[in-house]
Amino acid sequence: MENETHKAEILAQVMEKFDKNQCALVERMLSIMSNPVRFHILCALEKESFSVSELMVLSKSRVSNVSQQLKMMTLAGYISKERQGKQIIYTLKDGRIRELIHKLEELFGESR
């Protein structure tokens, strides 16, 4: 009985820490990052700002696909864009993405 009470307390703590709204935010972020093109773009933007054409070369994708992915991540609030002359430069905006990328590099980096 004591073990069941302990487990119920753990479950209550988890539910308090990650309510439905928090779970929705986590799901949204992981969904964005689960696409390989978006993930590579986010990893690049974590290091430096890039233009669409640079990200197109990096991701080996067509401009329409890169633009679509950038729009999705901009609308989600994870990246920002700024016009510099004729180019639009994208920058990582959300520090949580940066932290998550660092942790993923630590867990799944080349040396593993």
Regions found by a protein language model. Give the residues of each.
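N-terminal leader segment of winged-helix/HTH proteins
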Residues: 1-33
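N-terminal helix-turn-helix DNA-binding core of bacterial DNA-binding proteins
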Residues: 24-64, 88-95
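Residues within the DNA-recognition helix of helix-turn-helix
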Residues: 69
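Beta-hairpin "wing" of winged helix-turn-helix
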Residues: 74-84, 91
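Short, charged/polar, Gly/Pro-enriched secondary-structure boundary elements
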Residues: 96-100
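Residue-level signal for well-ordered alpha-helical positions
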Residues: 103-104
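An amphipathic, aromatic/His-enriched active-site/gating alpha helix that lines ligand/cofactor pockets
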Residues: 107
